Amino acid sequence: PPKCVNSLHFHNTAEVFFVLSGKWRFFWGLNGDAGEVILQEGDIFNIPTRVFRGFENVGTDYGMIMAILGGDDSGGGVIWAPHVLETAQSHGLVLSESGILYNTKKGQVLPAGEQPMAKLSEAQLAAIPETPVSKVVPDYVARYWDMMALARNRPCPVIGEASLIKDKPGFEVEL
């Protein structure tokens, strides 16, 4: 729905977003202020690995995005920003080390031997890049109408070693 927000997190594998409908703002950085881009239907975003990212529906109607995690570990593991862990806990939500979310307000408890995900240390946080817009947008975003123009006579390679988005997320995309 409009104003639906996904909190800042990162994965250890690639995460590629396909905007199926609506208007979406993707933002990144520890506090979500390192950069942002607005994407619309048909656009593709291969957000860099190990970069905190979030997104929200900024359209006036329901929207849908599809996310694909790449590599050999399609679960990708999820790491929440420290302030996201704190906010979640204030609402009774606990993310376990294994990436499972428990709602303590609904009586859910972590199983024996399972621990809550620890906050990243200052040293760990300092090692996570605050990638600038000038790097992210040209290198990791493919706009629908650009892809359509390039696909007029043959398939347009979108994600791959010799594509618009030069990356190896564990799969390739052509339009």
Region spans (language model):
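Short histidine-centered beta-strand/loop micro-motifs
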Residues: 6-11, 28, 36-38, 56-57
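A generic "binding-loop/recognition-motif" signal
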Residues: 2-4, 12-13, 51-52, 61
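Short acidic-glycine-tyrosine-enriched beta hairpin
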Residues: 30-49
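A short, N-terminal "cap"/entry segment at the start of jelly-roll beta-barrel domains
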Residues: 1, 96-175
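Double-stranded beta-helix
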Residues: 52-132
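Histidine-centered metal-chelating micro-motifs
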Residues: 4-7, 25, 43-45, 49-55
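Short, conserved beta-strand element in jelly-roll/cupin
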Residues: 10-30, 68-72, 175
